[in-house]
């Protein structure tokens, strides 16, 4: 059976069961509320129908498909034509032109965001027609924070869409006043400095230009409590608070993406009457002038260095050419927002940091990088699989996964030994003996990440995958040997002819030679073989035996030769005395291994032979003779060596730690089991049982009426007779009149509220909302909770009633609809917790995976994998063994297993929090729910984690509104959600540290309801599965994944282009590097062939939990952060200490000090807050104690650590004095600094 047929069949089963359950009436609606979208058009239409309910989903989806045939997929013109249809009333025949504009703009925005994010619903809050100064109508757009989810381009294009609708509707252009322009300037500046850093902050001149020329008003709702410092109370600006949505649209939208929009306008703007947007051309000139001016004022950019090197090019013709090697500029932006406890692994381009290497492994690419697993343990465990790092290039953020075929880290031990750490076992064994990490090892970055960033490549180090291709080219020129290179085939499958001839020519046995050719990472030549190959084929020396010559100066090279001449050679090893400190220092810089033996150090046989060979048997005279002619140490070595020596250092990349890896069950505040309100009666634990003991709950409930029992209830299905009930309404106007009347009687509003809640007032309740001017679905009720609990227990036939069943304080949805109490009881029994929409979710860091070995997975057998469709490995061999490499199917996922933590309730107890355990509990809950509440057969019947294999789950990323179908195929001890890059892209996310959530399929279909979603912006539609995608289309996922390279080999020309700093987009065309984007026409994405350049022994081999998570206090985290800085040579601990104090501790202390003077006060008993302490000193509401909300401890928590760092490390005098002054100020406020009278007089 075809892969997607299997998924469709499983999903169909789930829908059938869910529909039977929902039809019974226990849920807010009788239908499953997660519609299945068959294509992107349906997804978009389903999303917009959440606001425009009359929209015909099928008709709209068909229209989108027709327009795509005319203009192309995701073309902005499709959005413009959708606006035409909306304005003509062809989609919904609204009488109001504003409603037509609203429909058209939201639909167009939904289309270009692929119907995945909630930005068209929650980010674009409202459109209004307002009056210009001359009284003519113009269009105003109101944005809010969720517009961020659309991305900068879509946010900017939404303004273009709105202007197109404005012009078509005959509205006039916006006429900003001078005051409004100034307000935009100061508000964007305030947002950037006080709320959140903008990716791009336009200058005042840019803002003024844009506001004057954009034909619609970009407005917004307030998203922050902070007010603008000036230009308040403007007539057409409704708020004095900062409008985050507006700031994002102007700064990160139009200003940042102007070039992209202008390109489209010049292409087809006139055709659609948008030629007036050509003002963006003038804006781009202005932007360029301003940026050039700023660069000049700051002394200009530091240019990356260029070095001219003569290297042999093995192209059609083998010849030596001079190439200008272009190095990048150090970029220290990643250090600007450092957090205490999250270490810096290397400073910008610092020698010994991570060496940049091009390639992709099983679990890298799509913004994820690979490092050697030993590095994770040598860095005290701060790095774990899935840990985020922020760095210089190619992307701002990445997460790390293990790749064993990379260059390992190099360490200096306490006895002076310098060695490579080849394995995790070795790293753990020597961990306590390490004095310094000289080199962190490679970081593997996929070519696709450079392509996506539209970046220029940086020089690659000379590595095995480069060397072997030069070997191939030279061998074919020198002998009757042929190898068929193919970027889309692993070297193991390359067709080779004439191997016997080559074997005879080189004097290397045929079998050994084939191993070297086919397995360049694991079968490296010996030093003798390497020298023979280089001499006979004329290729550079193998990188395994090449020191990092560019790390030292020419003077140091001369010193090296002089010192080595003093050393002795014994048993083919160089021995030197420990007193030769200069020699040792140079060897450390060159990353040459040397080992302690008594008073001596020795260099192993291979490197001894290599050094003597490269340095022409330590020919000092020749070295001195060529000294002035050589440009650097590497050039000088090449003048001594009989064979060519290449640069194995390349470029180092600076990184710091970002967010730690994550894998845990989603829990709302209070960890409720059900969405049932228990008010104050539930106590601090919000416990239904505690409320039961009190006999009632006072909260707001939606009301229903049972015609059979002639009684009111809070459920759609009567808990007494089981019949469906009718919605009833409460007249707000009558309730207000009753309150006024009761107040005259009681003279106390508290008693009035109590009286109103204690009765359902017959005159206020109506069965039709047409009978009242202000109908509402809910009322404040003093509910007989005992009745509902007893009925729930009776229905479920529970004999052991749980002591803790947690509800919520109060419901937050529009009509205060509650979840059935039965569900809360069943979740409590199963030990699972509900999310705001009725589902149960498991959150995790998004980790990409394209290939795996069965042995990497827990809980799945070879037979089970075959059953799931994994029949052959990547080489075409039938699946028989656990070490075979398989290509992951696009919607299969791997979940965390075996995560152990201390219990919250009992610190001596260890509990599991992994997804395997979590979903076992969820499956048990769903089965109990089916059996006890819905009277249906259980579906999952899970006894052990292995039983979850093959089960359907839904994935949904934060801030999105569309879920994606996934299938569990196994578990690993990695803390993250491991899935195909296309699956992650289907949620409009990459894998740079983002997270996703996973829900068990049947739990979501049965228990999700839009009716439960909170009635506030960002919660009504965001992070909710409003629509479900079964089959992902490559063209309909985030286009970043289209740039992911899928080749097994980068061609030789690629490495030469990296030296030149060529643009990645040009290299793709020139070198024929295939990416997923080359397969956009492939309908079945499971058939796309995907390769990898670097194998790894196991995706599980590495640290699983970051030290950052294991350490409990900030002081501990900071101490270890500095301890690691002292251990890594590429980091200066003094700089780290200074950055931590300046960027984290001092701003935090100052902020809390400001907050202390403007704090509110809280009641310890009922949590009511007050702006000022009540005169009685007690809570007027309940008599509880009043306490601070900003405590002295909060202000001083980082002060001791800051002072300790300031004294221990060499930091700037200004920073140190600022800190000491802050310390004195705090002591003056809270005490601790005693002054004598003399001190006071002299102060």
Swiss-Prot record:
Nucleotidyltransferase as UniProt keyword: yes
Signal peptide (residue range): none
UniProt keywords, alphabetically: DNA replication, DNA-binding, DNA-directed DNA polymerase, Exonuclease, Hydrolase, Multifunctional enzyme, Nuclease, Nucleotidyltransferase, Transferase
One GO term (biological process): DNA catabolic process
Record keyword Transmembrane helix present: no
Pfam family, one: PolC_DP2_N
EC number: 2.7.7.7, 3.1.11.1
Domain of life: Archaea
Catalytic activity: DNA(n) + a 2'-deoxyribonucleoside 5'-triphosphate = DNA(n+1) + diphosphate; Exonucleolytic cleavage in the 3'- to 5'-direction to yield nucleoside 5'-phosphates
A GO MF term: DNA binding
Assembly with partners or alone: Heterodimer of a large subunit and a small subunit.
Role, per record: Possesses two activities: a DNA synthesis (polymerase) and an exonucleolytic activity that degrades single-stranded DNA in the 3'- to 5'-direction. Has a template-primer preference which is characteristic of a replicative DNA polymerase.
Membership in a protein family: Belongs to the archaeal DNA polymerase II family.
Descriptive protein name: DNA polymerase II large subunit
Source species taxonomy: Archaea, Nanobdellota, Candidatus Nanoarchaeia, Nanoarchaeales, Nanoarchaeaceae
Recorded name of the encoding gene: polC
